[in-house]
């Protein structure tokens, strides 16, 4: 089982993650994790904080001489902005100052419901942890998950599929080619024809003091049939993926495969017919069974079926606006325009990296549940035995 916890506030000294369940013998370096951290900080429409922070991970435990040793892995991402906040966010009582309390809650954020739940009269106690800054360390965890999955030729990649109603058309190309296209795009999209239109929209929205959302898509190839389970609600792979993606700040909807389109069609047009060709095995495929369509998005009955995993999710516009919405002061109860925190105009490209990370984490967990062992060597042996079984099935 692959599990993790994160800790840390947006303007605290650091973000921390502890990962348990990574087998011994996995090659892992700070450099490979930092690649994904840098991707998260890119993308057209990001805000001023990206000029301050240059995220770098520190591996504090669980890795020796470039290899995991089987014990919990501790990851740390320092907040460079901490030097400007060390008194405001200090754990020490001597720095307490009621004059810097934030009492104007922002619509669309956790500010008000969080303050009500935890009996806080300073919403900074809520907004610091609810901030999407937390996703930096989740991306680091996702990089570890991707390192594990890559040992078994499973690849995960996220893209921007839509921005502010402008839809990208996915080319019929292998995932590796789409990944290369997105890497060259400021918006992490696979459709270059709409990129300039998307950028113009972001510029317009910025000038208006507003924000814009979109739709991300995460694909995974090489996933074998048999991950997840139908026998309990909380082991269904699609349910796990949906929960993980919806846990990302500002995400409000998720679908697997064609998702909501299926509700407007008939069963004969939705369900993917099953075929068999023994020649596929000779060409290195995992199984002779296959589909000619993938409306299910690679998951049926909560179990991966061997086709490409396709997850799409909706991200709402960021609720921190430079043209703030009306709100109410939680102490005086007087109406005000909501507090303005430094923010992005559009974080959909960055969110595609975060979604990629959490999908990889869930796939790594499902993979370890199915093939788990204490070392990479043991897991590879287990996995090879399963592949031999599938080809004979």
UniProtKB/Swiss-Prot annotation:
Pathway info: Metabolic intermediate biosynthesis; chorismate biosynthesis; chorismate from D-erythrose 4-phosphate and phosphoenolpyruvate: step 7/7
Cofactor list: FMNH2
Any single GO BP term: chorismate biosynthetic process
Catalytically driven reaction(s): 5-O-(1-carboxyvinyl)-3-phosphoshikimate = chorismate + phosphate
GO molecular function list: chorismate synthase activity; FMN binding
Keyword Transferase: no
Keyword Membrane among record annotations: no
Free-text remark on how the cofactor is bound: Reduced FMN (FMNH(2)).
Keywords: Amino-acid biosynthesis, Aromatic amino acid biosynthesis, FAD, Flavoprotein, FMN, Lyase, NADP
Protein role: This reaction introduces a second double bond into the aromatic ring system.
PANTHER family for the chain: CHORISMATE SYNTHASE
Protein name (Swiss-Prot/TrEMBL): Chorismate synthase
Organism: Geotalea uraniireducens (strain Rf4) (Geobacter uraniireducens)
